Structure formats: structure tokens, C-alpha cells
């Protein structure tokens, strides 16, 4: 079994790249960072596993060494590759996506909590979520607020998946929550009241959405004068329910962020023109949070 002692990170990287090209599981020994302050940390090994789209197995400790195992993720086991005849149910209850809980990922949870605090969610009476799916965002809001604060809100969730909406209704049978099956491109047909806060996580970049016109429509027609908006931009992929940093692009085998950053910059500039104060944060999901007073 390979033993790493004083190799450089580049040497380790090259070894992993070569070996993982021909095997799905790779084990090796390395210095124990608990006993050797110069050894690579467990976080560094976890980062390397993610780079090579592997899952880091729990290391085995053997005195001054640890045994590390990388297990390749099955990249075909991803909702991104799902072949579904009914496009409205790509994210429905029978989809791979439906089993994902973004709120259980530490960086997503941390970034979303910060965005909700910036938006002062407790004071936003009318809240609209576009692409609500099974209502994970409403679940977090409910957990963050007191029962009295949550009961004062009027929350509306919209999704084109009928099965997801039916599931969300069962999870939130509260009188202050409404769930609607609708194509977001046809939002005007619902004649909704203007909102204090709009949230959309990973929906605005869908191929079926005309992003820039829809964003302008939301600001001009669906937000109140003193309002807030939270947009979540995926900078990652889900493989086997594991969140892997970096969104895949069609023509490259690495993450190319040009389109993502272009969308964020457009939103930032447009919202600033409309006198919103804008913040950008996050990692695997980049959050744009804006509010206007």
C-alpha cells in the first residue's frame, strides 16, 4: 500500500489522478495530522476526494499513520442526467432530486441562514418562493422563527411539479401557506399580490427560464417598494446525494464559471439601479441577497 510521508501536494495530486483513472476504490497510508503538525489535514484529504469526485471513507488510525480510502462516486447517479419524459416532473417525488436535502449541507445552510437574516425574513409578511419543490426553504424559515413570528407570515410556493406541490401541501397544512402548480414563466396569470420577499434557489438558471426578463419582471411587477430578494445560484453538482463543488459545463471537463458570474453580475447591477443594497455570499451555492428600504 502506498505510503505518503514528505511528498508535495503536487506529487500526491499526480498520484491520485493516475491511480483513480483505472480504479474505483483507492486506499493508501499518510501521516496522522493529530501527531504530525506538518501532515495534510483531514479537510485537505476531503478536498482532494471532492476534486476527483470521490467519497472519503472514514480514515482508519494506526498510530502515527492513517489509512485513507477514496471511493469514486457514480456520476451517472445524478438527477442532472435523469431521462424523464414529463419535464414538469424532473424534480417530482419520484426523481433523484427529490431525495436531496440542501439544508443538510453545512455551507448551504450557513449561507442561506445569513441571506435570510440580511433580508430580515421575520419582518417580511408576504413571501413568495419560486421553485419551492418540497418546501425545504419554508421548513428552514419555520425552524428559525418563533411560532408567533411564523404565523404572521403569508407564504406562497410555486413549482411546475404537481407531485412536489402535493407533497409540500401535506408538509405545511398551515393556514398561512399556499402552494400552486404553475409554470414560473406564466407568473402573471396568477395575479398574486406584491411581495415583501421573493426567494428562488437554483430555479432561475433552468434552461426553460428566460432569466434576465424574468428577473426584471419580478422586481418591477411582483415586489413592493420596500422589499427583498434572495437568489441562489448553483455552483455545484449533486452526485449520489453528495454535493460536489463546481457546476459542470457541456464543453469542458472542469467547472467554468463565466455564465454563472455573468448572471450574478447582471442581477447585482440591475438591483443596484433599482436602489437595492446587494450582498453576494456562499460557496457551493452563491447567494445574492438584496433589500430596499
Predicted regions and their residues:
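Conserved SAM/SAH-binding beta-strand->alpha-helix loop
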Residues: 161-162
Amino acid at each position: 500500500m502506498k505510503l505518503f510521508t514528505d511528498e508535495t501536494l503536487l506529487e500526491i495530486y499526480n498520484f491520485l489522478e493516475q491511480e483513480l483513472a483505472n480504479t474505483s476504490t483507492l486506499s493508501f497510508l499518510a501521516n496522522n495530522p493529530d501527531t504530525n503538525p506538518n501532515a495534510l489535514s483531514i479537510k485537505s484529504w476531503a478536498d482532494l476526494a471532492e476534486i476527483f469526485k470521490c467519497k472519503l471513507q472514514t480514515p482508519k488510525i494506526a498510530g502515527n499513520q492513517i489509512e485513507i480510502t477514496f471511493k469514486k462516486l457514480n456520476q451517472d447517479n445524478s438527477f442532472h442526467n435523469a431521462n424523464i419524459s414529463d419535464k414538469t416532473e424532473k424534480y417530482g417525488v419520484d426523481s433523484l432530486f427529490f431525495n436531496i436535502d440542501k439544508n443538510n449541507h453545512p455551507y448551504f445552510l450557513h449561507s442561506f441562514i445569513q441571506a435570510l437574516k440580511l433580508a430580515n425574513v421575520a419582518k417580511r409578511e408576504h413571501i413568495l418562493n419560486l421553485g419551492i419543490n418540497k418546501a425545504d426553504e419554508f421548513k428552514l424559515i419555520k425552524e428559525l422563527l418563533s411560532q408567533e413570528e411564523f404565523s404572521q407570515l403569508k407564504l406562497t410556493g410555486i413549482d411546475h411539479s404537481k407531485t412536489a406541490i402535493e407533497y409540500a401541501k401535506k408538509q405545511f397544512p398551515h393556514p398561512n401557506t399556499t402552494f400552486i402548480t404553475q409554470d414560473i414563466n406564466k407568473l402573471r396569470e396568477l395575479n398574486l399580490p406584491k411581495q415583501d420577499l421573493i426567494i428562488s434557489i437554483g430555479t432561475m438558471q433552468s434552461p426553460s427560464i428566460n432569466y434576465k426578463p424574468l428577473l426584471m419582471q419580478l422586481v418591477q411587477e411582483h415586489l413592493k417598494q420596500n422589499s427583498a430578494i434572495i437568489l441562489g445560484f448553483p455552483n455545484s453538482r449533486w452526485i449520489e446525494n453528495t454535493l460536489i463543488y463546481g457546476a459542470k459545463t457541456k464543453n469542458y471537463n472542469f467547472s467554468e464559471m463565466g455564465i454563472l458570474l455573468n448572471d450574478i453580475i447582471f442581477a447585482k447591477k440591475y438591483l443596484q439601479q433599482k436602489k437595492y443594497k446587494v450582498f453576494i455570499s456562499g460557496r457551493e451555492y452563491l447567494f445574492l441577497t438584496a433589500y430596499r428600504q
